[in-house]
Amino acid sequence: MEIVNVLLFLIILFLVKDFVKKNKKIHTKSPSGPIAFPILGNVVQIRFWELFKIQEHELIGNYSKKYNGVVRAWIGERLFLFVSNYDVVKYFQKDENFLYRPSLLVPGWRYASSNGLGVMSSSDDEWKRAKSSVSQSLRVHTSKKLMEEKAIEFIDSLEKISNNNEIFYPKGHIQGYACSMLFKYMFNQDLSVESGMSRTIGNAVEHVFGNLSKLTAFDCFEIFSPLYDWFFTRRLKGCDIVRQIISSQNENHLKSIDPSKPRDLMDDLLIEYGLNEITKEDTMQINQICFDIFGPAVGTVTITMNWVILQLCNRPELQEIAYQEIKKAVKDDEYVNLNHKQNAPYIVAFIKETMRLCSNGFGLPRTAKNDQICGDFFIPKDAIIFINYLEISQNEEIFKNAKEFNPTRYLDESLPVPNIHFGVGQRACPGRFVAIDKMFLGISNLLLKYKLKSQNGEKIDDTIHFSVSLKAKDYGIKLEKRI
């Protein structure tokens, strides 16, 4: 009986200690948050509100308003900060203390990043080297001609669907478009926009995005650490599918590379990391850099273009404005090219407005290398920080009439708006300009050839579904040829 009493006392003591640890402020400016329960932390509130169909990003948004834009949340043993206070975000833009990724702190991200490698998850000099290599390669190997040719191939692949009056399901076709362009840049390999490989990669990336967006007990409790690899090998199967493709390309490039004539990103990376002197660790870094590019180049582009098409269908009057602008810009040309972009600012603004309201969620996590005061808030070392881009985008102090879909807000130079579509600061996506060009070509050529309509004449469901980015439900539309 005494042993039972002692065990009961120790359990109660642990619960009290854990409760105090999670709720006690360690600094007068420590961020506040909802009551964190022992062991589970704020998982209790997340699961409770899910019963009432309130999604995680909605709940965090509500807390953001209550706690002045910086929400402290304990997910199991991990301390998270969700930041939508733009004054605090500005510190993240310019301060090197916030350049670091917490990939070794969250097991799911650790697995997806090969233990903190790549351009997304590495830090310090390794990250700077990776980013520099990718940025330079993008400038050399991403040509206007390549993007324009792939956009034409994408549009031409829809001819059969239109002629047969079939329903067009954008997501799969956009995945093919994005993968096809990426394969040429990354591996100098021609891949049809309709190829099975494109769909396989697109589905794998979507699988990874979806599963990384939801933290599991394995992410939040150290006690499960012996089972991390076993669990995430099964949960994140999409990672292994993409990695196998990249590894095969790496081996093939080593056999055929001419250092004096690099063909693509893989060649550039092999040369950068020493070619014949490449170690196993270098190979892992090269492959992870390529893996990291698949995410935004395929996943983010697909999600965003999918949203843009949905918004164009739901707003036929704005679709007509975009079409008339494009038609005027191209004149007698059969297809839209990047030379037309300067005369088609509205469609670029439409893409940015869609990203503002629909596709930007929490982005990728970062962490503080050291404790730091950021304005009215104390940011502790090793806290896992997510910038809540969706909440920032709906802040009336930053965006006038923030909840209104209004692309023209990006056309008025007297009213500058924050450029947060691809992250902030030095950690912003190095391929963001290529991504905009890719989406511009795909969407504008689609509009030039077809009027986009919902299947039944009613608005398409635009409910947001939480992921690494915020995605729309799968939907189909009608393609009506323009005369």
UniProtKB/Swiss-Prot annotation:
Main location per the UniProt record: membrane
PROSITE patterns assigned to the protein according to its UniProt record, in alphabetical order: CYTOCHROME_P450
A UniProt-annotated Pfam family: p450
Gene Ontology molecular functions: heme binding; iron ion binding; monooxygenase activity; oxidoreductase activity, acting on paired donors, with incorporation or reduction of molecular oxygen
Keywords, ordered alphabetically: Heme, Iron, Membrane, Metal-binding, Monooxygenase, Oxidoreductase, Transmembrane, Transmembrane helix
Keyword Membrane part of the UniProt annotation: yes
Protein's membrane topology: Single-pass membrane protein
Requisite cofactors: heme
GO cellular component: membrane
Binding site for heme: C429
Enzyme Commission code: 1.14.-.-
Membrane-crossing residue ranges in chain numbering: 1-21
Record's subcellular location: Membrane
Family of this protein: Belongs to the cytochrome P450 family.
PANTHER family: CYTOCHROME P450 307A1-RELATED (PTHR24303:SF31), HEME-BINDING MONOOXYGENASE FAMILY (PTHR24303)
Protein name: Probable cytochrome P450 517A4
Organism: Dictyostelium discoideum
Gene (name only): cyp517A4
